[in-house]
């Protein structure tokens, strides 16, 4: 884990954001719109691997509709994290799902209640 200099508890915050990211990628979470929606910030937006910009409204339902609840899980490689400010973590990693690889970046924000929510996500398909 990497961190911004001088941030107390950086490793803990990065670990918590990573756990939330892994949850958001699990088949169980992706197949359950209510569960996924709890992880999305109300001002969530994404630049998907398709190049489309996606907002909060309807995202969880769309993901659930496209998720096979007994399907292949998303494989994650080389996840790294940076604490950008107290309660704000950026994650970078590579994913593979159904033969398709993508470089991914997520920005997570801790709420006043201590829960982590994803504010921004971008996926870029890689060649190979």
What is each PLM-predicted segment?
Residues 1-8:
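Juxtamembrane and targeting peptides
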Residues 14-15, 27-87:
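A solvent-exposed, acidic/Ser-Thr-rich amphipathic alpha-helical stretch
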Residues 77-78, 91, 104:
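Residue-level marker for the onset of beta-strands and adjacent loop->beta junctions
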Residues 88-89, 116:
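Hydrophobic residues embedded in beta-strands of well-ordered beta-sheets
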Residues 91-97:
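Short beta-strand segments that buttress and anchor functional surface loops
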Residues 101-128:
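Short beta-strand edge/turn micro-motifs at domain boundaries
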């Amino acid at each position: 884990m990497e961190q911004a200099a001088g941030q107390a508890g950086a490793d803990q915050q990065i670990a918590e954001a990573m756990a939330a990211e892994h949850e958001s990628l699990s088949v169980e979470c992706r197949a359950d719109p209510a569960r996924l929606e709890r992880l999305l910030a109300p001002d969530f937006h994404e630049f998907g691997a398709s190049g489309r910009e996606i907002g909060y409204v309807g995202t969880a339902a769309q993901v659930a509709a496209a998720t096979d609840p007994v399907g292949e899980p998303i494989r994650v490689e080389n996840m790294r994290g940076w604490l950008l400010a107290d309660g704000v973590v950026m994650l970078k990693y590579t994913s593979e799902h159904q033969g398709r690889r993508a470089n991914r970046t997520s920005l997570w924000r801790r709420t006043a209640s201590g829960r982590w929510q994803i504010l921004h996500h971008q996926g870029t398909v890689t060649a190979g």
